[in-house]
Each structure stands twice: as C-alpha cells, then as structure tokens.
Regions:
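C-terminal terminal-subdomain/extension
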Residues: 1, 66-113
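Compact nucleic-acid interaction/catalytic patches
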Residues: 19-25, 29-66
Length: 113
C-alpha cells in the first residue's frame, strides 16, 4: 500500500467496536505524513468521508465536491480521525487539492485545540 497524504481511498472500516464509530466500506482521506506512509509502519491515520451531507458544521465536517472516482459530494468527518491497519486499504479514488488539505489541517487544529 503506497497511499499518500491527501489521497482519498476506499477502505474497509468493519468491524467497528462502538456504535458512534464510522464503519462499513467507505472512502477516507489519508492524513498521515508521507514519511510514515512510505515506510513499513503498519497503520495509517485517516479521516472518514460521509455522503450524508450536513450543512454548516465546520469545523466538525468539511464539504468536498465530486471528482475523479469520487462520485458524490461528501463531507470529511473531522472528528472521526483515527489510525487503521494498512490491510484495510482497497483502492485509491481521488485526491484533495493543496488548498483543501490546508483547510482540513486548520479545521482539525480547531477541533483539537
């Protein structure tokens, strides 16, 4: 698996341990730095996407528009950031722009500050 920071991948988040954790096979944004992504490190930090759109929820969610193999507009659910095993990655779908990555970093900083 050679995911890069800012890429959107299809992953298998099943099984989830708690009802408030996002599960299913779904798209996620890779948020881990590329030094770790390109090493033998066994996990990757991701942020899940949802196609159940909720308006006016920044900094908890960030809307992105469809592109490449991302077939629908989606919300990045910033509060669901987590690490997953690299075996869960299935297929690359799209990428965020540099501007979108900067905004995502800013929103995550707001959530954890």
């Amino acid at each position: 698996m050679m995911a890069c920071k800012g890429e959107i991948w299809l992953v298998n988040l099943n099984p989830s341990k708690k009802p408030n954790e996002m599960s299913k096979v779904r798209l996620v944004v890779v948020f881990q730095n590329n030094e770790l992504n390109h090493s033998d490190y066994p996990t990757t930090i991701i942020i899940p996407l949802s196609i159940s759109l909720v308006d006016d929820t920044e900094p908890l969610r960030m809307r992105i528009t469809k592109r490449e193999n991302l077939e629908k507009d989606s919300d990045i659910v910033v509060t669901q950031i987590r690490a997953i095993d690299n075996d869960r990655f299935m297929q690359k779908s799209a990428s965020l722009s540099l501007k979108e990555m900067e905004k995502l970093k800013q929103l995550l900083n707001e959530v954890v500050s």
